Structures are given as structure tokens and as C-alpha cells.
């Protein structure tokens, strides 16, 4: 049975959660952290995913890819490319399909990977983290993504999950997942017939700022309005600090970290830590050793100075809140509580700015780092056929209006806005078209100007075949079932022709009609389904051939990583065996090997050690195993003698202990017999004395 898995794919760190044991648990990674760095690194032989990638990032900046969620679906000529490019230390390149790829050095060769591939690598990593921690299979996942993700980006992230061997049961907006956490675990919500509780939920993470206005009742939640600033997050604060020190160090130390990616990245990492320290302290020191040209740098920053540096950002705090309220047709006076999540909301001046806009104190009912992942895990559990979860109904809204267009075959409209902006989903609509033959349809965004820059206006295309128009008619009605599914994807479920038929329906008899009255009928025209049309869809999803090809490539890379890890384990085991066996030959094994055996084994150890640090430094798993077994063939004989002697000693000790124990028991029994005998003699003497009397 698959364990429901919720993934909050963060831009800086990701959080993993599962539904189990009648609750939702956050999964810790291999170093017991409750979040995992969202990055992929590439080395001479293998990949560095998550924690290992973060560890090697400073020395491997050009081959470490961060900001994965920002380049999903991003086109190389997108107006926002330059904004994103400045946050990358790796080289971004243009793929054949016009999207952004990343060029890295891997295994001694230059490789280019798509954003979908890179994201799949990371998802595969965290999938195995969850499997190892839960000791269960993981097949279903609910992925939390930014609200501004377009249809194309949602398809791309779903493909990444499939490449990683997962079934994406739902793509959910991250603030919606957090709201599900709130609604499911909050016990004091209004009842079904009561006025709903209105919550303003503000999420500011590493790269995005989102505000959502939501209505809660017990067992249900509805999103009323959502707005965002997709270029406002913790990384912008980090960069402001880094740029400040870049200018300062240029004057103070005559170095320009902007010309040295490794140095800039080290200052950026230190700036992130400084930002966190200033959330709890009014001032903090700043220092980085040997940042470049063997120069150590040091400085300090106060909270007041930080607030001055980020003043341009703080001026943008108001917009997402006021826009979300406008969508919801509410004012700040209608808001009952303001909940904040996301690591960046810990910055004091930012919290104050949010509170000032709402005119209310802020609440931290939700875990700021884990609420999204827990909500996603609960949503995944809802889709599980084997788990029973607490009933909870929720509706999200699509910020973009979507229309459907079709071939104009009769004198009729050829376009219809089906899902207006901010309409709730999931939702299904049925439309009727008059068709003269086979036709095609498209789903498009109604107002391209309201989309994020660079977003494709076309969502999907469909071709329909099998339209048969009766000879006595000019056209035939076709019913088309349109749907915005739970993941916010606009699809067509089916299409079919209809025809009108005449049927006889009974007419109800008067109440005073005799029992043997003849039943009356009337002719009624009914519309029935006639022919289901053939349908071919063209979406942003990978086709089966492309998907299988990428799955095979990921499997190859995973197996390669596994082989490298196992090879390193065998190498370390061989090295440890050499040191351990050499030490024991002069110690506990000394009396159990002849001089000839010692000399032979020591020579073997020396030869193997020289090989290990020479030609064998980069050898194969099989070779390390063979070398280990070669040493063990003699070492185990000596070890066996030692263990046999130790066992003999243990047996002798155990026998002595048993003998001593039996002697103690015998002595105690003898003592008891002597005591009873003495007691009997005393009684006999007393009897004799009584006779004399």
C-alpha cells in the first residue's frame, strides 16, 4: 500500500510530509533535518542531490543548480529571464523548444538538462528519502506549487513527478494546501449554517509573496481571492545585503566579489544567515574567511540598516493584500484573523508592514515551514482509496480567465469564455456546438495582458473525429464536456453528438378517475446521446515516447549514483580493514599468527595500501571487493583462531562461573542442614531437661 506523500517544493528548501498512523508527519532527511535543500549538483562521477549538493555547493557553484521551481516552464527569451538569471551560478542555455536548460560539467563531459529533468532528479531524491524513512512504497504525491504557475508549468511539474516514478494525484496551490492544514486541524471553526471565518493568509517564502483571502467553516474552505508578487521573497533580502557588502568590500578591501561567482555565493550564503540573526537581534557581526585572493572580510549590520536596504521591497508589501481583498470583494474590516507562513515572514519589519496593512495583529497558528507540506499530504490522502480521512471540502480559484474556441462551421459564435477569472474549481461545464463535420478546439487565456510575462496564451488543443450529419440536416448538435480539474488544468472529458427522438410518456390520471380507466400517453421529444466522438488532445504534457525516454535516463543516472555510492562504501571498507587488521596483528592477533603469516599479511596490507592510494584511488566496486577478499582470506584465518580462543576463554569462564555457582548453592544447602541439625539438638536437650524436672 502506498503512503500518501505531500511535497512542498520550495525554491530554497523543500518539506516532505506523509499521512500515516492517523496523522500527518513531516519526514526528516538523511541528516535528520525537517527540510531538504532544493538543489541538484553534478560532480566528476555522480550527482549531489539535496543535502550533499548543499555541502558541496561552495566549491561547485558552476555545477550546482538552485531555484528549480523558477525555471520550470521558463522560456529563454522570456522578458523575465534576466531577472531569474542573476540568481543562478550555473549557466542557463536555450533548448530546442525555446525553454531554459542548464549546462553543467558532469562525468568529465558537458551536459545540458531541462528544468523538468532537474526537478525530476530532486523529486526522485526526496521520494527515496520518504521511502527509507517510512519503510513503505511511495507512488502517489500531491505537489504544492505557486499560485502564479501557468497551465504549462503545472504540466511540467507533473511530468517531473512522473519521471521520478510518482503519480501526481493533484497539483495544488501552496497557500491552498496551507489553508487545508488550518481547516482540518482547527477545532473552533463556525458550523455549516454560521457565518464563515474570514482569514487572510500571507505566505512569503524564498522567492514569492502570496496573499489569499479564505472563508472557513467546519469541514470546508473556499478561496475568495488570491494575489501575488512573484519577485518578492527571502532571496531578494539576501541579495540586497550581499550587494551592500559587495560595495563596502570593494572600497575596504579592494576586491570585487561580483566578478568571482564563488566569492559572491559565499557572501550570499553568509548574508542569508545574517538576515536570520537580525530577526532576533538588533545588530550582528559579519565575517567570511578567505573570500577571494586569500582575503578575510568582516563587517557588521544593524536591523535598522537592513530595513533601509530593503525599503524598496517594503513599499511593495501592500499590493498583494489589497488586490486579494478586491478580488474577494472585502475590506480589511471583514478579516477575522491574519495568518502568516513562510520563512521570510520572520523578519520583524516585514511582519510589522503586513500587520499595518491589515490593521490587525498577526497570528502564527500554522507552522510557518511545514503547513504547506502537511496540507498537501492530507490532500493526497483524500485521493487514496485505502485511507479514511476526516471529511474536508475545499474550493480554489483560478486567477486567469479561460475561453474555448472552435472552428466556425455554421453562422454562430466561435468563442466562449467558459471559466471567468477567479472562478472556483474543480468545475465542469457542458456546451453545445452545431457541427457540420470533424472539428478542432482550443483552450486559451482570455486576457493575455493579465498573465505573467512570457506565458503562452494557448493552453491546449483538441481534434474531434466521427461527426456524422444526417442527410436531411445541415448540422448536428455536439455536446462538449469541459472541465477545470482539481489540479487547475483545463481539459475536455468527452464530446458526443445528440439527436432528438419522440417517445410516449404516460399522462397522470385525475384523482377521481376509476380504477379501470385506460392509461393516457403523450408524445414528448427527448435529446439523447448518439455517437461518442474520437478525441486527440495536445497539451503541454510530455508525450509517452518523450516521457519514457526521460524515465530511462533518470533510471540510468540513479543507478550510476548508486554504483558510485556503493563503490565508495567498498573503498572505505577496504581502507578501514587495512588499518584495523594491521593494528590487531601487533596486538590481540599477535599470538595467533606465525611469524611467516604476519610477514606475508603485512606485505599484503602494504601492497594493497599503496595500490589504494595510487592506481586504486579511482577503481571499481568489484576491484575493491576483490582486494578486500584477498586480504580477508588470510586475515579471517587468524581472526578465526583468535575468536576460537576467545570463545574457549568464555566457555572456561562460564564453566568456572557455573562451578562457583553450584559450590555456592551446595554451601548454602549445607549451611541450612547444619542450622536445622543444631536446632534439632537444641530441642532434644530441652526435652531432656523437662524429663529431669
From Swiss-Prot:
<dbReference type="GO" id="GO:0005634">
    <property type="term" value="C:nucleus"/>
</dbReference>
<protein>
    <recommendedName>
        <fullName>Heat shock protein homolog SSE2</fullName>
    </recommendedName>
</protein>
<keyword id="KW-0067">ATP-binding</keyword>
<comment type="function">
    <text>Has a calcium-dependent calmodulin-binding activity.</text>
</comment>
<dbReference type="InterPro" id="IPR013126">
    <property type="entry name" value="Hsp_70_fam"/>
</dbReference>
<dbReference type="InterPro" id="IPR029048">
    <property type="entry name" value="HSP70_C_sf"/>
</dbReference>
<dbReference type="GO" id="GO:0006457">
    <property type="term" value="P:protein folding"/>
</dbReference>
<dbReference type="GO" id="GO:0005524">
    <property type="term" value="F:ATP binding"/>
</dbReference>
<dbReference type="GO" id="GO:0005829">
    <property type="term" value="C:cytosol"/>
</dbReference>
<dbReference type="GO" id="GO:0043161">
    <property type="term" value="P:proteasome-mediated ubiquitin-dependent protein catabolic process"/>
</dbReference>
<keyword id="KW-0112">Calmodulin-binding</keyword>
<dbReference type="InterPro" id="IPR043129">
    <property type="entry name" value="ATPase_NBD"/>
</dbReference>
<dbReference type="GO" id="GO:0042026">
    <property type="term" value="P:protein refolding"/>
</dbReference>
<dbReference type="GO" id="GO:0005737">
    <property type="term" value="C:cytoplasm"/>
</dbReference>
<dbReference type="GO" id="GO:0140662">
    <property type="term" value="F:ATP-dependent protein folding chaperone"/>
</dbReference>
<dbReference type="Pfam" id="PF00012">
    <property type="entry name" value="HSP70"/>
</dbReference>
<feature type="compositionally biased region" description="Basic and acidic residues">
    <location>
        <begin position="664"/>
        <end position="679"/>
    </location>
</feature>
<feature type="region of interest" description="Disordered">
    <location>
        <begin position="653"/>
        <end position="693"/>
    </location>
</feature>
<dbReference type="InterPro" id="IPR018181">
    <property type="entry name" value="Heat_shock_70_CS"/>
</dbReference>
<dbReference type="InterPro" id="IPR029047">
    <property type="entry name" value="HSP70_peptide-bd_sf"/>
</dbReference>
<dbReference type="GO" id="GO:0010499">
    <property type="term" value="P:proteasomal ubiquitin-independent protein catabolic process"/>
</dbReference>
<dbReference type="GO" id="GO:0005516">
    <property type="term" value="F:calmodulin binding"/>
</dbReference>
<comment type="similarity">
    <text>Belongs to the heat shock protein 70 family.</text>
</comment>
<keyword id="KW-0547">Nucleotide-binding</keyword>
<dbReference type="GO" id="GO:0000774">
    <property type="term" value="F:adenyl-nucleotide exchange factor activity"/>
</dbReference>
<feature type="compositionally biased region" description="Acidic residues">
    <location>
        <begin position="680"/>
        <end position="693"/>
    </location>
</feature>
<keyword id="KW-0346">Stress response</keyword>
Amino acid at each position: 500500500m502506498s503512503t500518501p506523500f505531500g511535497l512542498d517544493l520550495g525554491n530554497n528548501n523543500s518539506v516532505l510530509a506523509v499521512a500515516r498512523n492517523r496523522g500527518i508527519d513531516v519526514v526528516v532527511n538523511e541528516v535528520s533535518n525537517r527540510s531538504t535543500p532544493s538543489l541538484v549538483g553534478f560532480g566528476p562521477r555522480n550527482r549531489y542531490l539535496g543535502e550533499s549538493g548543499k555541502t558541496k555547493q561552495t566549491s561547485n557553484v558552476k555545477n550546482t543548480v538552485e531555484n528549480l521551481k523558477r525555471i520550470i516552464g521558463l522560456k529563454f527569451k522570456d522578458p523575465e529571464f534576466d531577472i531569474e538569471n542573476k540568481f543562478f551560478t550555473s549557466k542557463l542555455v536555450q533548448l530546442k523548444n525555446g525553454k531554459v536548460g542548464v549546462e553543467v560539467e558532469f562525468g568529465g563531459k558537458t551536459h545540458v538538462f531541462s528544468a523538468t529533468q532537474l526537478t525530476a532528479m530532486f523529486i526522485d531524491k526526496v521520494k527515496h528519502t520518504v521511502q527509507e524513512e517510512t519503510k513503505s512504497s511511495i507512488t502517489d504525491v500531491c505537489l504544492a506549487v505557486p499560485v502564479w504557475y501557468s497551465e504549462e508549468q503545472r504540466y511540467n511539474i507533473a511530468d517531473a513527478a512522473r519521471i521520478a516514478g510518482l503519480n501526481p494525484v493533484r497539483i495544488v496551490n501552496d497557500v491552498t494546501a496551507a489553508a487545508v492544514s488550518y481547516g482540518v486541524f482547527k477545532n473552533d471553526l463556525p458550523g455549516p449554517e454560521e457565518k464563515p471565518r474570514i482569514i487572510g493568509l500571507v505566505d512569503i517564502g524564498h522567492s514569492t509573496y502570496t496573499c489569499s483571502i479564505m472563508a472557513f467553516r467546519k469541514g470546508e474552505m473556499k478561496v475568495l481571492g488570491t494575489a501575488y508578487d512573484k519577485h518578492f521573497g527571502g532571496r531578494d533580502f539576501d541579495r540586497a545585503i550581499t550587494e551592500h557588502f559587495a560595495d563596502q568590500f570593494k572600497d575596504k578591501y579592494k576586491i570585487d566579489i561580483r566578478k568571482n561567482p564563488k566569492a559572491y555565493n559565499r557572501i550570499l550564503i553568509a548574508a542569508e544567515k545574517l538576515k536570520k540573526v537580525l530577526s532576533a537581534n538588533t545588530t550582528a557581526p559579519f565575517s567570511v574567511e578567505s573570500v577571494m585572493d586569500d582575503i578575510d572580510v568582516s563587517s557588521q549590520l544593524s536591523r535598522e540598516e537592513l530595513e533601509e536596504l530593503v525599503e524598496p521591497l517594503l513599499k511593495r508589501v501592500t499590493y498583494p493584500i489589497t488586490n486579494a481583498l478586491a478580488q474577494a470583494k472585502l475590506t480589511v474590516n471583514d478579516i477575522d484573523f491574519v495568518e502568516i507562513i513562510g520563512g521570510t515572514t520572520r523578519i520583524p519589519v516585514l511582519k510589522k508592514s503586513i500587520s499595518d496593512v491589515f490593521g490587525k495583529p498577526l497570528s502564527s497558528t500554522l507552522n510557518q515551514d511545514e503547513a504547506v507540506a502537511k496540507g498537501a499530504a492530507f490532500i493526497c490522502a483524500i485521493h487514496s482509496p485505502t485511507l479514511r480521512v476526516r471529511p474536508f471540502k475545499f474550493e480554489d480559484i483560478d486567477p486567469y480567465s479561460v475561453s474555448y474556441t472552435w472552428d466556425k462551421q455554421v453562422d454562430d459564435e466561435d468563442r466562449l469564455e467558459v471559466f471567468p477569472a477567479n472562478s472556483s474549481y474543480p468545475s465542469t461545464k457542458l456546451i453545445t456546438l452545431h457541427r457540420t463535420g470533424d472539428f478542432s478546439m482550443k483552450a486559451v487565456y482570455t486576457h493575455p495582458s493579465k498573465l505573467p510575462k512570457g506565458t503562452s496564451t494557448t493552453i491546449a488543443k483538441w481534434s474531434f473525429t466521427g461527426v456524422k450529419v444526417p442527410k436531411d440536416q445541415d448540422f448536428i448538435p455536439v455536446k462538449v464536456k469541459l472541465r477545470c480539474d482539481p489540479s487547475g488544468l483545463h481539459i475536455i472529458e468527452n464530446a458526443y453528438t445528440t439527436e432528438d427522438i419522440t417517445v410516449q410518456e404516460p399522462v397522470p390520471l385525475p384523482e377521481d378517475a376509476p380504477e379501470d380507466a385506460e392509461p393516457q400517453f403523450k408524445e414528448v421529444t427527448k435529446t439523447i446521446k448518439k455517437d461518442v466522438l474520437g478525441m486527440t488532445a495536445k497539451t503541454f504534457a510530455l508525450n509517452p515516447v518523450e516521457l519514457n525516454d526521460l524515465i530511462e535516463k533518470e533510471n540510468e543516472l540513479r543507478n550510476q549514483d548508486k554504483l558510485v555510492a556503493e563503490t565508495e562504501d567498498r573503498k572505505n571498507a577496504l581502507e578501514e580493514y587495512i588499518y584495523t587488521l594491521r593494528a590487531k596483528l601487533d596486538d590481540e592477533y599477535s599470538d595467533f599468527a606465525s611469524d611467516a603469516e604476519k610477514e606475508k599479511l603485512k606485505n599484503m596490507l602494504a601492497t594493497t595500501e599503496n595500490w589504494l592510494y595510487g592506481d586504486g584511488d579511482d577503481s571499481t566496486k568489484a576491484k575493491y571487493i576483490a582486494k578486500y577478499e584477498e586480504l580477508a582470506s588470510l586475515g579471517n584465518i587468524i581472526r578465526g583462531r583468535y575468536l576460537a580462543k576467545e570463545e574457549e576463554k568464555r566457555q572456561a569462564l562460564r564453566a568456572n562461573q557455573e562451578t562457583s555457582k553450584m559450590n555456592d548453592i551446595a554451601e548454602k544447602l549445607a549451611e541450612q542442614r547444619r542450622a536445622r541439625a543444631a536446632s534439632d539438638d537444641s530441642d532434644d536437650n530441652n526435652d531432656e531437661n523437662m524429663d529431669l524436672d
